[in-house]
Amino acid sequence: MELKVTTLEGKDAGSVQLSDEIFGLDPRSDIIQRCVIWQLAKRQAGTHKAKGRAEIWRTGKKMYKQKGTGGARHGSQRVPQFRGGGRAFGPVVRSHAIDLPKKVRAMALKHALSAKAKDGGLIVIDQATLDSAKTKALVGHFAGLGLTSALIIDGAELNNGFAVAARNIPNIDVLPIQGINVYDILRRQKLVLTKAAVDALEARFK
């Protein structure tokens, strides 16, 4: 699969050959969905907490005698049916993470990349560098490329000027190749890869 390479200024910079094993698959939405669910579950804080009857600070004395009052039998004021009592089956601090095999995660990433390529949402640029961290200049470059919502993936190290300039632009994410993931690929309209990112992906899945 051959794709044109452009510069940030929108000039032609040749072409690149993309591996069909990574970018040319028939996308499987079920595998992509499994990976997205895994990612979103893993990032949940799980810090929700409600006090149960054992954690409520209240007297443990029996409310009134067992017999002779005509009222229902009660032993504790900490039970859920009373105002101020403990919560029955309330949320507890826990991890929401689920297991997903590494092979399935790797497969999902390939299918997400293939889905972008199939939909025409994949752009390859020669490099993502700026001499100075000027957001205004980068906004102009993105307008020329037609980027309003994009995930930009560079090599192992980001260019500091580019990363700082892009930080304040809405709907633009910049990540090193180590941070590429299915959810971020899907949540933006365009996926922009540098040539270094393409080489790193092909080396990763070789």
Swiss-Prot record:
The keyword Ribonucleoprotein applies. It comes from Rhodopseudomonas palustris (strain BisA53). Part of the 50S ribosomal subunit. The lineage of its organism: Bacteria, Pseudomonadati, Pseudomonadota, Alphaproteobacteria, Hyphomicrobiales. GO terms for molecular function: rRNA binding; structural constituent of ribosome. GO terms for cellular component: ribonucleoprotein complex; ribosome. Belongs to the universal ribosomal protein uL4 family. GO terms for biological process: translation. NCBIfam families: rplD_bact. It comes from the Bacteria. InterPro entries: Ribosomal_uL4, Ribosomal_uL4-like, Ribosomal_uL4_dom_sf. HAMAP family: Ribosomal_uL4_B. This is Large ribosomal subunit protein uL4. The gene is rplD. One of the primary rRNA binding proteins, this protein initially binds near the 5'-end of the 23S rRNA. It is important during the early stages of 50S assembly. It makes multiple contacts with different domains of the 23S rRNA in the assembled 50S subunit and ribosome. Keywords: Ribonucleoprotein, Ribosomal protein, RNA-binding, rRNA-binding. It holds the Pfam family Ribosomal_L4.
